[in-house]
Amino acid sequence: MLFRSACVSARDFRWERGDIKCISMLGNVLARQLSADHGAVETVMFRDGWLTEASASNVWVAHEGALLGPPTSEHLLEGVRYNLLAELCEEVGIAFNLRPIAEADVRAADEVMLSSATKEILAVTQLDGEYVGHGAGRGKPGPVYARLYEAYQRAKAEQSI
C-alpha cells in the first residue's frame, strides 16, 4: 500500500546549527505544530530559498526519474534513514544525487517524499495546498516513490534495516 501526505512549508527559522540534535529542538517543535495546525503531516523548510529539511524528516525530490536530496550541512540533521535512501536507489537502479535544491525546484518536482525512522518513506502529494507532480500522476505517489517504498519494505522484512 502506497501512502500519501499533505505538507506545508515555512522559512527555516531555526538556529544556524540544525545539524546538532540537542535538547533544545524548539524550532522543530514549532515547525511541527505549524503542520498540525494546517492538518498536514510535516512542515518542509527552506532557508534563503533553499531546501533544508522538514520538522522531523529529511526531504527528497524526484526529477526525471532521479532522486535528489540536499547535502548534509549545518542546516540539516542527517536522519537515521538519510543514507539508506542512497542504498535503496542503488539497489533498484535509481540515479541518486545530493546537491542544493532551490525552493522553486521542490515546487516544480515530479515527486517529493519524506524519510524518517517513524515515517519510513512517505510520498508528499500536496505542498501548501498545491498538488505535487504533473499530468495524470499529479497529487499521487509517483513511480520513484513506489520503487523505493517497495525496496524499503523488502529491507524491513529481511530485517536489514
Regions found by a protein language model. Give the residues of each.
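Helix-start/capping segments and mature chain N-termini
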Residues: 1-161
